[in-house]
Amino acid sequence: MGRKSNESCSSSLHVSSISQENHSQWNLDAEELFDEKETFSSENDGAAGGKTNKSHLENPAEQLILQLTVSEHAHSRSQQNSSQGVFQLWSSPVNKGSTVDKRNSSVEENVTDESDLSENEKMNDSLLSYFKKMDLNLKPETIEHVERPFPEEAGQVPVYADFLPAPFNTLDLHRFAFSKCESWKAAVEPPESSIERLILRLLELERLQHMTIQRERPRLQSTFYSSMFSMAERPSSSKAIATKAKAPKIPETSTLQTSGVDKNRDKRKNNSGSGKPEQNVSKWSLSSAGKSKSNSRALLKCSSTSKQCAVAHDDLKNSKNSSLNPCQEPPLKPTTTTQATQPMARVVSRCLPPRSPMPVSPIPLSFPENPREEGKVPRTKKKCHRKSILLNRAFYIQKRNCLSPSLIARGKCSPTDQK
């Protein structure tokens, strides 16, 4: 035991005398030895089937050395992490190798990227570099504005260049263009073939120009007149709009109405012998006046065209020629008001009684001049007539009940009621 303790002390002193420079290498070697022994021991344990490891028991000094190196390595790692960060001394040679490998790989990648460029891109780069080197001084030429005097008189005709040579430039092309034959040849000497073709072409152009002018002239006139009409149709003020908005006048209805009223007046004079009392006539005038008002309103709504007036006149004639049927109401006495219309005249002509064979002298009847007074009287009489109807209705019902055989048998009705 004393020998073993001396060996362990000497080994510990030997470890403490190791310099700090070789400390990292020693740590790496110790770790490698430790790993190899662990693997070796695991293999021996698997082969022996659970036998004890004799090497660990035989060499306790090596175990102590390994423990000391591991503890020192942990202590140095904690100090380096606190002072310098994550950098570790024991792994420094490995990190240096990795950084060198990374640099080499980045250089290779750059080379491959340059080689991946296509030929077109390389050509474009070369062209851009070529154009950048070019220095072009492009400047516009300066034009000098020189004002030259141009003598022009007020009555002078502008001179144009002659298309034809001297003997032919005096030809009146407009006059010769519409000649039936080639009279221009007689006016001048016969020209050469080329000049003759040029003269013929100029004459043809003159002819075409004249035809186009004649064709476009009516179009210009039509457009001018249409614009003038459009300007005239526009109302100049609000008064013109008001006059257009007014209802159109009825030109021929008044003449038709007057003629119809006169004819009806003659008929009524002939048939006045079979007239009724004045009260019934006033009733008839009131009802006919109401009808005439409604018909006049309907007539005013209609348009006053000549065709419609002609149709109305034909209807009036047909109604006069038709057979006259008697009506329940008496004929109408003519009034001073001009409210008689065409439909009213038609109704009167249909409702007149047949003519009597014996001539009867007319009976003059007096009517109020104001139509308002005329309308007031029959209204009151109408009301009285209605009251009399209501009063007589009860007696009529009683009389009808008395005529029934059942009531007569019972003796409820008096003999006077039965009569």
Curated annotation (Swiss-Prot):
The gene is Fam217a. It holds the Pfam family FAM217. Residues 252-261, 271-281 have a biased composition (Polar residues). Belongs to the FAM217 family. PANTHER family: PROTEIN FAM217A, SI:CH211-266K22.6. Residues 7-19, 236-251, 282-296, 334-345 have a biased composition (Low complexity). Residues 1-60, 96-119, 236-299, 317-382 are annotated as: Disordered. This is Protein FAM217A. It comes from the Eukaryota. Coiled coil: none annotated.
